[in-house]
From Swiss-Prot:
Function: Important virulence factor of HSV neurotropism. Seems to be required for glycoprotein B-induced fusion. Dispensable for growth in vitro.
GO cellular component: membrane; viral envelope; virion membrane
Localization per Swiss-Prot or TrEMBL: Virion membrane
Protein name: Envelope protein UL45
Keywords: Membrane, Signal-anchor, Transmembrane, Transmembrane helix, Viral envelope protein, Virion
Stretches assigned to the Intravirion side: 1-27
Family statement: Belongs to the herpesviridae HHV-1 UL45 family.
Topological domains, Virion surface: 49-172
Membrane topology: Single-pass type II membrane protein
Species, as recorded: Human herpesvirus 1 (strain 17)
Pfam families: UL45
Keyword presence, Transmembrane helix: yes
Length: 172
């Protein structure tokens, strides 16, 4: 007796459910999209603007840029008490290291200028002799000296991250 095709057809053992596709939940897609979007935004911030746009903010009016800080000075020699009280906040007397750099770069020693600068001494009367860059305190600083006010400018953490990333990638 010949077999019919319907007798040998596949028959499931029980009532089946439609096959389920493996899917990520919507929250996972939102999370992945947020991460990818954040990476793209940070990459655009790092790569698109020029290095100049990540520079330090300009010094205030009447101040001059010096390294990572701003300086202002009075060409009249004065006593320590006047010098300390003459710098407007957030400025203070120039730190010793910055004063040495400024003296070396500017070669400011002249017949009309004072031979000393007042420098920041954390409450101690401190000065810097311009001729040789030697610093001293108290009785070493007897004569009037020039007041140079200084305030530092520092880039924020994100700017440091951007500039170091650009340096690592060799970008201008």
């Amino acid at each position: 007796m010949p077999l019919r095709a319907s007798e040998h057809a596949y028959r499931p053992l029980g009532p089946g459910t439609p096959p389920m596709r493996a899917r990520l939940p919507a929250a996972a897609w939102v999370g992945v999209g947020t991460i990818i979007g954040g990476v793209v935004i940070i990459a655009a911030l790092v790569l698109v603007p020029s290095r100049a746009s990540w520079a330090l903010s300009p010094c205030d009016s009447g101040w001059h840029e010096f390294n990572l800080g701003c300086i202002s000075w009075d060409p009249t020699p004065m006593e320590h008490e006047q010098a300390v009280g003459g710098c407007s906040a957030p400025a203070t007397l120039i730190p010793r290291a910055a004063a040495k750099q400024l003296a070396a770069v500017a070669r400011v020693q002249s017949a009309r200028s004072s031979g000393y600068w007042w420098v920041s001494g954390d409450g101690i009367r401190a000065c810097l002799r311009l001729v040789d860059g030697v610093g001293g305190i108290d009785q070493f600083c007897e004569e009037p000296a020039l007041r140079i006010c200084y305030y530092p400018r520092s880039p924020g953490g994100f700017v440091q991250f951007v500039t170091s990333t650009r340096n690592a990638l060799g970008l201008p």
